[in-house]
């Protein structure tokens, strides 16, 4: 048996496939979904959504959203998506270093929130390279 997975962003369909499993970046931690999972609705934070097809994990950086799981169907509605390109690992590491500096130097509440979001995205990108 397999899961039917659809990932949709505001600008359109990102992913539509059958898969062996999926790991969602929920607000309470990583949430693994396999066939036969109980019905569930969960919020997603910025992080790595992983889809397992043909015994291989594919990472997708999601920028928050939510997921609905029912009857081996996984519908993921996300606020946005970031691409993970294999050749960009060193660039991702330098962006992560800059994001840490920006957060340390942030003074206003808005600067802190913006820098925190950028740090989460940069950190997810660097971690995603483990799966490609």
Swiss-Prot record:
Tell me where on the tree of life, at the top rank, the source sits: Eukaryota
Cite the GO molecular-function annotations of the record.
ATP binding; proton-transporting ATP synthase activity, rotational mechanism
Gene Ontology, cellular component aspect: chloroplast thylakoid membrane; proton-transporting ATP synthase complex
Which residue ranges traverse the bilayer? none
InterPro entries documented for this protein: ATP_synth_F1_dsu/esu, ATP_synth_F1_dsu/esu_N, ATPsynth_dsu/esu_N
The membrane topology of this protein is: Peripheral membrane protein
Q: Which keywords are on file for this protein?
A: ATP synthesis, CF(1), Chloroplast, Hydrogen ion transport, Ion transport, Membrane, Plastid, Thylakoid, Transport
Cited CDD domains: F1-ATPase_delta
| Pfam families (alphabetical) | ATP-synt_DE_N
Q: Which family does it belong to?
A: Belongs to the ATPase epsilon chain family.
According to its UniProt entry, the function of this protein is described as: Produces ATP from ADP in the presence of a proton gradient across the membrane.
Q: Which PANTHER family match?
A: ATP SYNTHASE DELTA/EPSILON CHAIN, ATP SYNTHASE EPSILON CHAIN, CHLOROPLASTIC
The entry describes its oligomerization and partners as: F-type ATPases have 2 components, CF(1) - the catalytic core - and CF(0) - the membrane proton channel. CF(1) has five subunits: alpha(3), beta(3), gamma(1), delta(1), epsilon(1). CF(0) has three main subunits: a, b and c.
**Which named protein is this?**
ATP synthase epsilon chain, chloroplastic
Species in which this protein is naturally found: Pylaiella littoralis (Seaweed)
The coding gene here is atpE
């Amino acid at each position: 048996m397999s899961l039917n997975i659809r990932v949709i962003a505001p600008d359109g369909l990102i992913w539509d496939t059958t898969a062996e499993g999926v790991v969602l970046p929920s607000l309470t931690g990583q949430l693994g979904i396999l066939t036969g999972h109980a019905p569930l609705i969960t919020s997603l934070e910025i992080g790595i959504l992983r889809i397992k097809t043909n015994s291989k994990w594919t990472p997708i950086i999601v920028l928050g959203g939510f997921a609905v799981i029912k009857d081996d169907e996984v519908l993921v509605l996300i606020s946005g998506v970031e691409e993970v390109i294999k050749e960009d690992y060193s660039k991702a590491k330098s962006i992560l270093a800059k994001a840490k500096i920006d957060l340390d130097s942030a003074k206003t509440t808005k600067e802190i929130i913006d820098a925190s979001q950028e740090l989460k995205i940069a950190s997810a990108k660097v971690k995603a390279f483990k799966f490609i």
